Every structure is written in structure tokens, then in C-alpha cells.
Design a protein with these regions (language model features):
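Long, charged, low-complexity intrinsically disordered regions
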Residues: 88-90, 104-109
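C-terminal edge-of-domain segments
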Residues: 175-219
């Protein structure tokens, strides 16, 4: 990547950052109680711009330095707070944010790339299960301090690309015949997404445990 191309790319990033700054100012001046829909639109726009900026910055880093993609994205997973654990036959993946809307590859890339390398690093020191028949549960947790109008339909969320990443590590196949998907919306202390992968025989027990400990506002 030559100097002229780098400068052009940086100017594009600066323009995106300026748009983000303007949107954040608008958010700060919007009465969230009187105009929750406007605030929701602005916050969504700001979040998408932030993801776009992060992804563009990654590509600039890869193209203009000697930083390896795998090294950077492993660090990005740590910074984002992605956590992976296993307990009682359930693989749990914690994402400290809500799932992106279906708005294009870059919005998903912000999350899926670090997740892939975080799973890869975890697999280096842990023996991951390989499920033949499984259930993958997406728990979409919204901060109880913010308006319920923020809750989104599952059909508008980008789940398929995330499922493909997880499937590469723990599933023999993510087809409908071998994998059932379950979504739940809950209230919590902060926005986040918890993904639980388990054998079908474990699902009913997991669901009962979840209902006993979490306050749910809707299930699907």
C-alpha cells in the first residue's frame, strides 16, 4: 500500500469519525424519554459507524504494517471481552455486546473475526466437543436501565455468520437436520449476548435452569 493510498484511506477514516462525532452529539442532545425512537435510530447509526471504522482500521493495519491478522484479532478478542467456557456438557460463549443487524459483511466482521481467533486459541489448550445433534441458544440480554423499545426482532439480527464460525469448531454440520436454534430475550445488567451450545438431550435441563435464574421478557 503506497503513501498516497494510505493518505486517501486515512482521510476516509477521518470523515467517518467526523460523522460518528456528529451522531454522538445528536444522541447527547436527544431526550431519550420523550423521543426513544429517535434516540434508538441515532444510537444504532453510531454503533454501525463505530464498527465500520474499526473494520477499516484493521484493513489499514494489515495493508500498511507487518502485523499478522491472527495476532491482532486474538488481541481484539481479548479487548472486546469475548470469553469461552465449558460446564456440564455446555459450551458457553460470552460476547459483551448485542448481535449486529443485517447490514452487510463489515458489521458482522467486527465480531466474527475476533471470535474465530479466540475460539482457535481456546481450542489449542482445550478439547472442544464435536456435536452431531445439537441446540445452539442465543440469549440476547438488554440492559434493564435502557428503554424496552430497543429490543429487536430476531429476524433482523446477523446470526448465520456467527453460527458458521462456531460450527467450524464444535459442530459436524450446522444444517437444520442436525442443529436447532433457540433465541431468548432477557433483561440484565448490561447489553451482551450469551451463546450456549449443547447436545439436544441437554437442552430441556438447560432451559429449566435458565428459567429458574434469569428474568425473561420474551421467548421464541
Amino acid at each position: 500500500m503506497n503513501r498516497a493510498h494510505i493518505s486517501k484511506y486515512i482521510n476516509s477514516l477521518l470523515a467517518d469519525i467526523s460523522k460518528l462525532s456528529n451522531t454522538l452529539c445528536a444522541m447527547n442532545n436527544t431526550d431519550i424519554e420523550r423521543y426513544p425512537d429517535n434516540y434508538g435510530m441515532l444510537s444504532t447509526d453510531a454503533a454501525l459507524h463505530s464498527e465500520l471504522i474499526a473494520c477499516k482500521m484493521r484493513h489499514l493495519l494489515y495493508g500498511s504494517t507487518n502485523m499478522k491478522k491472527s495476532e491482532y484479532l486474538t488481541s481484539a478478542g481479548v479487548v472486546q471481552g469475548i470469553r469461552i467456557s465449558e460446564k456440564d456438557g455446555v459450551l458457553n460463549i460470552f460476547l459483551p455486546r448485542l448481535m449486529p443487524r443485517r447490514k452487510g459483511r463489515k458489521n458482522s466482521e467486527f465480531l466474527t473475526d475476533p471470535l474465530y481467533f479466540t475460539l482457535s486459541q481456546y481450542a489449542d489448550s482445550h478439547e472442544l466437543p464435536k456435536f452431531q445433534h445439537c441446540v445452539i441458544c442465543f440469549s440476547h440480554i438488554y440492559s434493564k436501565e435502557l428503554p424496552l423499545s430497543r429490543v429487536r426482532d430476531y429476524d433482523n439480527l446477523e446470526l448465520k455468520q456467527l453460527l458458521d464460525v462456531i460450527a467450524a469448531f464444535v459442530m459436524e454440520d450446522d444444517s437444520g437436520l442436525l442443529c436447532d436454534a433457540y433465541n431468548t430475550t432477557e433483561l440484565g445488567e448490561q447489553d451482551c449476548t450469551c451463546i450456549s451450545v449443547m447436545g439436544k438431550e441437554r437442552f430441556s435441563e438447560w432451559l429449566e435452569e435458565r428459567e429458574n435464574r434469569l428474568k425473561s421478557i420474551s421467548d421464541f
